[in-house]
């Protein structure tokens, strides 16, 4: 039976585990820079300049990691 892969969770978990700096663009154009500390189905906790912020996912437009994220190796580890 083929497993479904959740790209969003895989991507965010990799950013969190590898402590990769990320720029988050919100739908209103505002930018947040920092590190993903935690996430769930609706929110993300980002550590930005020593302060933690809880951001709702529906307010996020784009994530831009500081370095490339390989999702293929993560998918292989899950299988």
Curated annotation (Swiss-Prot):
Sm domain boundaries: 9-69
Classification via Pfam families: Hfq
GO biological process terms on file: regulation of DNA-templated transcription; regulation of RNA stability; regulation of translation, ncRNA-mediated
Alphabetical UniProt keywords: RNA-binding, Stress response
One Gene Ontology CC term in the entry: cytosol
Keyword Ribonucleoprotein: no
Keyword RNA-binding recorded: yes
PROSITE patterns: SM
Gene Ontology terms, MF aspect: RNA binding
Entry-linked SUPFAM superfamilies: Sm-like ribonucleoproteins
Domain of life: Bacteria
Known partners and oligomeric status: Homohexamer.
Job of this protein: RNA chaperone that binds small regulatory RNA (sRNAs) and mRNAs to facilitate mRNA translational regulation in response to envelope stress, environmental stress and changes in metabolite concentrations. Also binds with high specificity to tRNAs.
Family listed: Belongs to the Hfq family.
Database matches in HAMAP family: Hfq
Name listed for the protein in its UniProt record: RNA-binding protein Hfq
């Amino acid at each position: 039976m083929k497993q479904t892969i959740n790209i969003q969770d895989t991507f965010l978990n990799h950013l969190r585990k590898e402590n990769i700096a990320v720029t988050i663009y919100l739908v209103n154009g505002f930018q947040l820079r920092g590190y993903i500390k935690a996430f769930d189905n609706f929110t993300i906790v980002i550590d930005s300049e020593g302060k933690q912020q809880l951001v709702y996912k529906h307010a996020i437009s784009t994530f831009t990691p500081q370095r490339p994220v390989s999702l293929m190796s993560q998918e292989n580890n899950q299988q």
